[in-house]
Amino acid sequence: MPQLPVAVVSPRDTAEVQRIVTVCARRDVPITVTAGRSGVSGASVPMFGGVVLDMTAMSGVVSVDNTSGVVEVLPGTFGPDLEQALAQHNLTVGHFPQSFDISTVGGWIACLGAGQFSTRYGKINEMIVGLEIVLADGSVISTGGAPAAAHGPDASSLFVGSEGTLGVVTRAWLRAHDVAPVRKKSAYFFPSFADGVKAMREAIRAHATPAVLRLYDAVEAQRSHGGDGANSTLIVLDDGELEIVDATLAVVDRCARAHGATAAPVERVDHWLAHRNDTSGLQALTKKGFVIDTMEVAAPWSKIGAVYQGVLEATRSVDGARSVSAHVSHSYLDGACIYFTFVGQISSRDINDATTAEHQALYVAMWNAAQRAALAAGGNL
């Protein structure tokens, strides 16, 4: 169970982080590194008490190399603050996770984040030029710093995704892109989720990588976009130079229609843009006593269909499961990520009378079913 920390400390620079870490190391005091606290896996919870290191005081853009397209930024900088600073230079990092408004650069790095425009701009690990890190003994190291290297291993990669367990990121150098002059959108209905996956795979394999390429199954399309519940929906958005954007969307259109797609109102994309970070609907269900969570699974294209069907069937078989849906959120040359949402309700009696233990049991049962099915089908959590 989580424990109360003995102190919450907010360092203002690298030197203060060094002093805090050194003192804690000498006394075997555990440190939990936090910032926006938007994560849902508990990494910012002090399980062993000790000291909570709140990095939000170390915030701001230090410098911008407009010629090279590199921004030097402090770890406690929240997403909107970073993008507002870069907009003055007509630049963007292109990293827009659902937690964009309430998460920080350091958190993105620590949790190996992927933004909603990742098909074009990549995940956070692909944006990192270099890092400054305070290690567990209080020493400071710098990694990377160049566009590429002909030697290895890549030291930065040791800390990306380590969730503050191997060191404290105190500074980052990230790649920045020129703000795109053109944005275009399209949307499609598919007769089945499987048809949509085939179209996505063909587009990606043809190196058509629009900034946004998201496929919703019929259940999630209806909930997210107000569909009729009969069709899966693909939304497409691309930024860039006009010729490149037109060519990219033309390839996606060809692949979509080859698998039975029909044009959907482009307003579906506008609706997603306006509401993409809104979780109020799910939160409202939680307040009514429903059990809700999400799970993201990566799989090669050859196993995406089996993962999708396996997770849906296994989770729906749990007593109390009410809804299981999915969308493909990130695509790669060899596979994609499926983002599942499951909703459960205690069915034995009035939901308001259900105990915490019953809710926890249902939650664990749905998670166990979903995870085991995903792994059995060849997915990676």
Language-model region placement:
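C-terminal substrate-recognition/cap domain of FAD-linked oxidoreductases
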Residues: 178, 184-192, 197-369, 377
